[in-house]
């Protein structure tokens, strides 16, 4: 029997029937691109033994730290750790967050083995402080292990991966939380319809997205998680983001037209993923996942690092009540002459997650500080990012999220020069809501650059004297000054001088404001591929600029808490 060698922990009566002998018993492929296609196409999905041997091969090739516990270590310690206790009664360590162990059609020996292996992992990896995916990972790999010790060694190698460019499993709350924030960022950009629905029906969309890994490692049926894991072992962490975004898209497609209650949407999502086989095949799930044109692995890594840094700056490195992590726009604390609390919450759902940690902070309003561009700069410099809100005399409302400090304009002297990053976006709220993001998000081919020219530009424009590590500026999405993109006009984010402010450029300007902040104009521009944000020429009634209050550093501006 095919399962004899690797089926010791499996209850075969509960497993879905499937062809077992239709694939070769060895993996001869060594070319990465070919291996990637085989994984995506489910080449070893039909043979339990082949999949087991592929997993063994791929996991053995993971670069690990020098001292990584192996099967012999497990055999030495398991008796001491378990003692005379029943395996089924072993408590799970706190770092798995009391998550229920997915059964994955394991037999009673298998479910006990999961607890024994996790207990030994806890003993050998004292640096793990938060790893909710671990029970699912162990239960899955038990299917493809000859004994507990082999499973322990394979899990240990995944946890001990030391390739800085190959993120596999989050093992701290900081890493986990920043992953949730990164998923929220990606959902806002690549799943705008589903994200809008989640914001509308959820009291806390960030709390909802904190479950994104559980959808995969916990809720997905076994036939689906194995197909995902096939690709994950070849391509890495980015696959998980793709699959979770695809799940969100399918949920929106299937449930979007049905009434949902805010207190049930989290459970509804979990149930939808658990019963995914009722509406979506594993092939369709992966097809949808890989149809999403995500940013590069480098881009996502930079975004993750930025989110981690934001959490560290807030002192958030260990698990705590979520309301202490994400601070919402509270009705009793927020006052604007342009937008309502609900509208500000909608805007908050659009901004990068690391800034949603902060509260809105009023920096400038023409009602208090006057209609003067010089005063605008005076009150806004030193703050990044900022949120610009404009209300016209015709009661139209529009604005922009601006990623970069306005003092950056001084680098070019008196010359009007564009700066900013791909996180900038423009929007209108009245008469209808519409957001326009960087055109490269939907058309990544516009952002493809010659790597050598990008590196050269990055190194020349960002010197060590300003205290910025050039390696953190190699991304056209996060870099302050755009690189040699095929179309320069696709990266004209923001510019300012004593004579005007311009947001968005290339064959028009998304927003142009005069030096007295009295009049402006708006049109289509290449950077955001936007429609005019209001009447093409308009008179400003009210203008507000909001910053993001760092709770660790309360400066003199007007906080929305007052």
Swiss-Prot record:
State the PROSITE patterns in the record: TLDC (PS51886)
Membrane topology annotation? Peripheral membrane protein
- Keywords, comma-separated and alphabetical: Cell membrane, Cell projection, Cytoplasm, Cytoplasmic vesicle, GTPase activation, Membrane, Synapse
Q: Which GO terms describe its molecular function?
A: GTPase activator activity
Q: Where is this region: Disordered?
A: 450-471
Q: Where is the TLDc domain?
A: 337-549
The residues covered by the Rab-GAP TBC domain are: 42-259
Chief site of localization: membrane
Annotated Gene Ontology cellular components are:
cell projection; cytoplasmic vesicle membrane; plasma membrane; presynapse
Q: Which residues bind a 1,2-diacyl-sn-glycero-3-phospho-(1D-myo-inositol)?
A: 36, 40, 238, 242, 293-297
The record's note on quaternary structure and interaction partners says: Interacts with ARF6.
Its biological purpose: May act as a GTPase-activating protein for Rab family protein(s). Involved in neuronal projections development, probably through a negative modulation of ARF6 function. Involved in the regulation of synaptic vesicle trafficking.
Q: What is this protein called?
A: TBC1 domain family member 24
- Origin organism of this chain? Xenopus laevis
* Taxonomic lineage of the native organism: Eukaryota, Metazoa, Chordata, Craniata, Vertebrata
Q: Which gene encodes it?
A: tbc1d24
């Amino acid at each position: 029997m095919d399962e004899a060698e690797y089926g010791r922990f499996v209850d075969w009566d509960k497993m879905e029937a499937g062809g077992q002998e239709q694939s070769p018993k060895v993996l001869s492929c060594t070319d990465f691109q070919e291996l990637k296609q085989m994984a995506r196409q489910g080449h070893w999905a039909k043979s339990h033994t082949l999949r087991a041997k592929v997993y063994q091969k791929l996991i053995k090739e993971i670069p690990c730290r020098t001292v990584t516990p192996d099967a012999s270590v497990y055999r030495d310690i398991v008796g001491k750790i378990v003692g005379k206790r029943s395996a089924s009664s072993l408590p799970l360590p706190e770092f798995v967050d009391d998550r229920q162990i997915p059964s994955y059609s394991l037999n009673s020996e298998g479910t006990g083995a999961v607890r024994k292996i996790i207990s030994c992992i806890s003993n050998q990896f004292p640096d793990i402080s938060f790893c909710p995916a671990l029970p699912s990972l162990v239960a899955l790999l038990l299917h493809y292990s000859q004994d507990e010790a082999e499973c322990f060694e394979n899990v240990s190698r995944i946890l001990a991966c030391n390739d800085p460019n190959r993120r596999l499993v989050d093992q701290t709350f900081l890493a986990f939380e920043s992953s949730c924030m990164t998923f929220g960022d990606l959902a806002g950009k690549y799943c705008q319809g589903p994200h809008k629905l989640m914001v509308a029906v959820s009291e806390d969309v960030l709390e909802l997205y904190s479950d994104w890994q559980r959808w995969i490692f916990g809720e997905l049926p076994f036939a689906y998680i194995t197909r995902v894991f096939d690709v994950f072992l070849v391509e890495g962490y980015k696959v998980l983001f793709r699959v979770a975004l695809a799940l969100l898209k399918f949920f929106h497609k299937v449930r979007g037209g049905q009434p949902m209650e805010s207190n049930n949407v989290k459970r509804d999502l979990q149930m939808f993923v658990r019963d995914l086989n009722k509406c979506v095949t594993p092939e369709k799930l992966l097809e949808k996942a890989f149809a999403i044109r995500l940013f590069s692995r480098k881009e996502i890594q930079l975004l993750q690092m930025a989110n981690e840094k934001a959490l560290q700056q807030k002192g958030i490195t260990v698990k705590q009540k979520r309301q202490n992590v994400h601070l919402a726009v509270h009705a009793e604390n927020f006052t604007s002459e342009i937008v309502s609390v609900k509208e500000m919450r909608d805007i908050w759902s659009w901004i990068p997650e690391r800034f949603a940690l902060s509260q809105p902070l009023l920096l400038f309003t023409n009602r208090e500080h006057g209609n003067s561009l010089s005063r605008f700069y005076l009150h806004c410099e030193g703050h990044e990012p900022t949120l610009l809100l404009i209300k016209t005399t015709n009661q139209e409302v529009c604005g922009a999220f601006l990623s970069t400090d306005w003092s950056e304009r001084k680098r070019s002297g008196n010359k009007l020069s564009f700066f900013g990053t791909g996180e900038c976006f423009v929007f209108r709220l009245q008469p209808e809501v519409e957001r326009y993001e960087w055109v490269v998000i939907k058309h990544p081919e516009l952002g493809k650059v010659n790597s050598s020219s990008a590196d050269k530009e990055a190194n020349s424009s960002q010197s060590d004297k300003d205290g910025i590590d050039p390696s953190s500026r190699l991304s056209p999405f996060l870099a302050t000054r755009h690189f040699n993109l095929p179309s320069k006009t696709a990266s004209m984010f923001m510019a300012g001088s004593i004579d005007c402010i311009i947001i968005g450029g290339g064959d028009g300007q998304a927003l142009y404001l005069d030096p007295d902040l009295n009049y402006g104009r708006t049109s289509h521009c290449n950077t955001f591929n936007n429609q005019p944000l209001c009447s093409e020429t308009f008179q400003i009634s009210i203008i507000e600029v909001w910053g993001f209050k760092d709770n660790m550093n309360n400066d003199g501006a007007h906080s929305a808490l007052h």
